[in-house]
C-alpha cells in the first residue's frame, strides 16, 4: 500500500486529495485559498471531520509545507516520506505531451513554455509542481494533462481553416480541455450501462463554471468543444465560448474596452458568459434564483446557455452518427436538475428523455425514461482519482 497525493494548483489556490493506493481510498482532502493574500484559508477534511485555519500564506511552496504539516498534525501521516507519489493537473500539454508524464529532464520547462496555450492555468500548475519538488524532491512526480485525452482527435476535427503556416509554425489548432474528466466519466458510463467502452458512442458534458462537451467513440475523443484555449466552445460562467472573431477588431475600433491583448482576454474570459449577459452572477444557482424572480437578463442568459449546449450535443450526434448515452458531470451537470431537464427536453426528438422522478438533486446514475433510445446519465467526475491512478501506473 502506498500514499499518493493529487494536486490541482490555481494561481491563488491549491486543491488536494490524498489516496491510499491501490485501494483508491481517500484518506484526506483539502483546499488552500487566497495564496499570496492576507488571511489565506486552509481547509482539511478527514474521517468525517473538517478543520479550517486562517493564515498568511505567501506562495505555493509555503502552502505545500502547511499541507504536509497538517497531514502530520492530524495523524494522517507520520512523516513526509510516507507519500511516495504526487500527481499534478496541468491544463495544456499541447502536441508535445500526449499522455501523463514523469517530471524529469526538461518536462517542467516544457510545461511552462506551453503557458502560451493556457496563460490562466499552466503557470499556476507549474508553481505547484515546483513547490512539491522543493519539499519532496525524491518522490515520483507526475504531470497529468487536460489535453491528453483529446490527442486522439482526427486532423479534420482539430485543424482550423486558417493558412497552414499558422499550424505548422505557430501550432494553432484545437487542443480541448477537461480531458481527464471526460475520460473518467466515459469509463464510468460503460460500467453503468454494462457494456464495453469500445462498443459505445457517448457525448460527455462537463458543465461547471467552465464547461466543455466531447464526442467519445470507442473510448477515444473524436471532437470536443473547447479549442485552442479553454475559451472556445459553449457559453460558460464568465467565458464567451464561440463568438464571431470579427467582433474583436470592431470593439477595438469603436470602444475603449479593447485597447490591449490583456483587455481582450479579461473581457472574454472573466466578464462574459452567464455573468456578462445576466449582469448578475456566474453561478447557476444565482441565475436560477433570478429567473424564478422574473429577471429578464438572467432568463436570457439561462436560455442562451442551454441553447449553446443543445447545439453542441446536436453537432456531436451528427459526428458520431447517433449516441448510446449523454453524460452530465461537474458542478452544474451533476447538481442542476432543472438545467438537465431543459437541455434534454429541447433535443428529445433525437430519442432522449428525462424521467422527472429520477432527475432530482443529488441523484446519480441513469435518469432516462424507460422508452428513451439515448440514455441520459449523471456521473460525478473524479479527476483526482485519475491523477492518482496515473501516478501509480508510472511509478511502476
Curated annotation (Swiss-Prot):
Oligomeric state and partners?
Homodimer.
Q: Which gene holds the coding sequence for this protein?
A: ackA
Q: Which reaction does it catalyse?
A: acetate + ATP = acetyl phosphate + ADP
What the entry lists under HAMAP family is as follows: Acetate_kinase
Task: Tell me yes or no: is DNA damage among this UniProt entry's keywords.
Answer: no
What is the top-level taxon of the source organism?
A: Bacteria
Q: What's any one GO cellular component for it?
A: cytoplasm
Family affiliation: Belongs to the acetokinase family.
Question: What role does this protein play?
Answer: Catalyzes the formation of acetyl phosphate from acetate and ATP. Can also catalyze the reverse reaction.
Protein's UniProt name: Acetate kinase
What PANTHER family does its record include?
Answer: ACETATE KINASE, ACETATE KINASE-RELATED
Q: Where is this site: Transition state stabilizer?
A: 178, 239
Organism name: Streptococcus pneumoniae (strain Hungary19A-6)
**Where is this protein primarily located?**
cytoplasm
Q: Name one Pfam family in it.
A: Acetate_kinase
Annotated substrate binding sites: 89
Amino acid at each position: 500500500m502506498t500514499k499518493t497525493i493529487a494536486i490541482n494548483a490555481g494561481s491563488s489556490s491549491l486543491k488536494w486529495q490524498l489516496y491510499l493506493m491501490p485501494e483508491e481510498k481517500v484518506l484526506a482532502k483539502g483546499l488552500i485559498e487566497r495564496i499570496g493574500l492576507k488571511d489565506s484559508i486552509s481547509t482539511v477534511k478527514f474521517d468525517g471531520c473538517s478543520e479550517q485555519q486562517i493564515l498568511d500564506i505567501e506562495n505555493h511552496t509555503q502552502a505545500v509545507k502547511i499541507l504536509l504539516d497538517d497531514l502530520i498534525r492530524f495523524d494522517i501521516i507520520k512523516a513526509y516520506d510516507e507519500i511516495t507519489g504526487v500527481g499534478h493537473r496541468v491544463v495544456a500539454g499541447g502536441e508535445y505531451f500526449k499522455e501523463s508524464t514523469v517530471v524529469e529532464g526538461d518536462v517542467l520547462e516544457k510545461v511552462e513554455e506551453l503557458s502560451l496555450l493556457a496563460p490562466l492555468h499552466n503557470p499556476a500548475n507549474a508553481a505547484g509542481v515546483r513547490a512539491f519538488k522543493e519539499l519532496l524532491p525524491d518522490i515520483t512526480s507526475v504531470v497529468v494533462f487536460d489535453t491528453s485525452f483529446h490527442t486522439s482527435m482526427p486532423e479534420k476535427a482539430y485543424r482550423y481553416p486558417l493558412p497552414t503556416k499558422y499550424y505548422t509554425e505557430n501550432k494553432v489548432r484545437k487542443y480541448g480541455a477537461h480531458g481527464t474528466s471526460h475520460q473518467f466519466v466515459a469509463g464510468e458510463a460503460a460500467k453503468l450501462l454494462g457494456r464495453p467502452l469500445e462498443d459505445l458512442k457517448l457525448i460527455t458534458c462537463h458543465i461547471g463554471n467552465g464547461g466543455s462537451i466531447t464526442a467519445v467513440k470507442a473510448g477515444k475523443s473524436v471532437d470536443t468543444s473547447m479549442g485552442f484555449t479553454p475559451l472556445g466552445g459553449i457559453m460558460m460562467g464568465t467565458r464567451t465560448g464561440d463568438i464571431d472573431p470579427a467582433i474583436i477588431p470592431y470593439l477595438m475600433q469603436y470602444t475603449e474596452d479593447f485597447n490591449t491583448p490583456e483587455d481582450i482576454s479579461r473581457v472574454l474570459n472573466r466578464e462574459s458568459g452567464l455573468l456578462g449577459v445576466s449582469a448578475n452572477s456566474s453561478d447557476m444557482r444565482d441565475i436560477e434564483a433570478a429567473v424564478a424572480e422574473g429577471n429578464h437578463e438572467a432568463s436570457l442568459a439561462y436560455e442562451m446557455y442551454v441553447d449553446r449546449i443543445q447545439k453542441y450535443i446536436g453537432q456531436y450526434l451528427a459526428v458520431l452518427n447517433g449516441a448510446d448515452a449523454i453524460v452530465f458531470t461537474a458542478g452544474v451537470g451533476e447538481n442542476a436538475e432543472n438545467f438537465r431537464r431543459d437541455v434534454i427536453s429541447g433535443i428529445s426528438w433525437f430519442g432522449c428523455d428525462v424521467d422527472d422522478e429520477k432527475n432530482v438533486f443529488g441523484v446519480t446514475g441513469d435518469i432516462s425514461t424507460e422508452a428513451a433510445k439515448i440514455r441520459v446519465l449523471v456521473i460525478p467526475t473524479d479527476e483526482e482519482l485519475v491523477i492518482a491512478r496515473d501516478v501509480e501506473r508510472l511509478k511502476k
